[in-house]
Swiss-Prot record:
Cellular component aspect of the GO annotation: extracellular region
Known function: Potassium channel inhibitor (Kv).
Family membership: Belongs to the short scorpion toxin superfamily. Potassium channel inhibitor kappa-KTx family. Kappa-KTx 4 subfamily.
Disulfide-bonded cysteines: 43-61, 47-57
Signal peptide: 1-26
Protein name: Potassium channel toxin kappa-KTx 4.1
Keyword Transcription among UniProt keywords: no
Intracellular or extracellular location(s): Secreted
Propeptide, residue positions: 27-38
The keyword Disulfide bond belongs to this UniProt entry's keyword annotation: yes
Tissue expression notes: Expressed by the venom gland.
Domain of life according to the entry: Eukaryota
Length: 64
Protein backbone atom coordinates (compact mmCIF):
# COMPACT_ATOMS: atom_id res chain seq x y z
CA UNK A 1 0.00 0.00 0.00
CA UNK A 2 2.83 2.40 0.88
CA UNK A 3 4.52 1.62 -2.41
CA UNK A 4 1.38 2.50 -4.40
CA UNK A 5 0.95 5.72 -2.43
CA UNK A 6 4.58 6.71 -3.02
CA UNK A 7 4.30 5.94 -6.73
CA UNK A 8 1.10 7.99 -7.01
CA UNK A 9 2.70 10.91 -5.15
CA UNK A 10 5.74 10.80 -7.39
CA UNK A 11 3.56 10.67 -10.48
CA UNK A 12 1.58 13.70 -9.28
CA UNK A 13 4.80 15.64 -8.67
CA UNK A 14 6.08 14.81 -12.15
CA UNK A 15 2.79 15.90 -13.74
CA UNK A 16 2.83 19.17 -11.77
CA UNK A 17 6.43 19.81 -12.83
CA UNK A 18 5.54 19.25 -16.49
CA UNK A 19 2.52 21.57 -16.25
CA UNK A 20 4.62 24.26 -14.55
CA UNK A 21 7.37 23.94 -17.18
CA UNK A 22 4.81 24.15 -19.99
CA UNK A 23 3.24 27.31 -18.58
CA UNK A 24 6.64 29.02 -18.16
CA UNK A 25 7.63 28.01 -21.69
CA UNK A 26 4.30 29.32 -23.05
CA UNK A 27 4.92 32.69 -21.37
CA UNK A 28 8.42 32.78 -22.84
CA UNK A 29 7.10 32.06 -26.35
CA UNK A 30 4.38 34.70 -25.93
CA UNK A 31 7.02 37.24 -24.88
CA UNK A 32 9.20 36.36 -27.87
CA UNK A 33 6.25 36.81 -30.24
CA UNK A 34 5.47 40.21 -28.70
CA UNK A 35 9.08 41.33 -29.11
CA UNK A 36 9.10 40.11 -32.70
CA UNK A 37 5.95 42.08 -33.48
CA UNK A 38 7.41 45.21 -31.90
CA UNK A 39 10.50 44.87 -34.12
CA UNK A 40 8.40 44.24 -37.23
CA UNK A 41 6.20 47.33 -36.90
CA UNK A 42 8.95 49.95 -37.59
CA UNK A 43 10.33 47.78 -40.39
CA UNK A 44 6.90 47.47 -41.98
CA UNK A 45 6.16 51.19 -41.67
CA UNK A 46 9.49 52.16 -43.23
CA UNK A 47 9.07 49.64 -46.03
CA UNK A 48 5.56 50.91 -46.79
CA UNK A 49 6.86 54.47 -47.04
CA UNK A 50 9.45 53.33 -49.58
CA UNK A 51 7.61 50.71 -51.65
CA UNK A 52 3.86 51.00 -50.91
CA UNK A 53 3.44 47.23 -51.41
CA UNK A 54 2.06 45.58 -48.25
CA UNK A 55 2.77 41.99 -49.30
CA UNK A 56 6.41 42.77 -50.17
CA UNK A 57 6.91 44.61 -46.88
CA UNK A 58 5.33 41.83 -44.87
CA UNK A 59 7.65 39.24 -46.41
CA UNK A 60 10.71 41.49 -46.16
CA UNK A 61 10.12 42.36 -42.50
CA UNK A 62 9.33 38.80 -41.40
CA UNK A 63 12.84 37.68 -42.43
CA UNK A 64 14.54 39.86 -39.77
Amino acid sequence: MKSTLMTASLLILVVLFIIDYASVYAEFIDGEISLERERDIPCFETCMKLYHIPKLCYIKCRKH
